[in-house]
Amino acid sequence: MSEDIKAKALDIQKLVEYQDDTVVSREVIKKELGTVTFFAFDQGQGLSEHSAPFDAMVQVIDGEAEITISGEKHTVKAGEIIIMPANEPHALQAVNCPYKM
């Protein structure tokens, strides 16, 4: 974890910024039991289908995400969360607009 963010109130919107035609990530906590990573997806960008050996929570903090879990598409908007179950294939896309999570 970056020392500059410990024990401070942070503006979650400013932890990661959009960049044209790419996905930007910032890992803020990395522990043996899990990580906390912020992402900014430009429109049209995403993460291809994959799975993980643990549950993962996505909280959309700006925009709107299309998240596919085991073939079922979900639209998740700013202020909403979704839990992606362990070992289930999932993918994330910025279809209609950029988003941060």
Where on the chain are the PLM-derived regions?
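Short, surface-exposed secondary-structure edge patches
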Residues: 38, 57, 72-74
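Short acidic-glycine-tyrosine-enriched beta hairpin
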Residues: 71-86
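Short, conserved beta-strand element in jelly-roll/cupin
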Residues: 40-42, 52-67
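Conserved catalytic-core motifs of eukaryotic protein kinase domains, centered on the activation segment
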Residues: 51, 71, 95
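Ligand-binding loop in jelly-roll beta-barrel domains
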Residues: 86-101
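Conserved short histidine dyad/triad with adjacent acidic residue
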Residues: 22, 36-52
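A short, N-terminal "cap"/entry segment at the start of jelly-roll beta-barrel domains
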Residues: 1-33
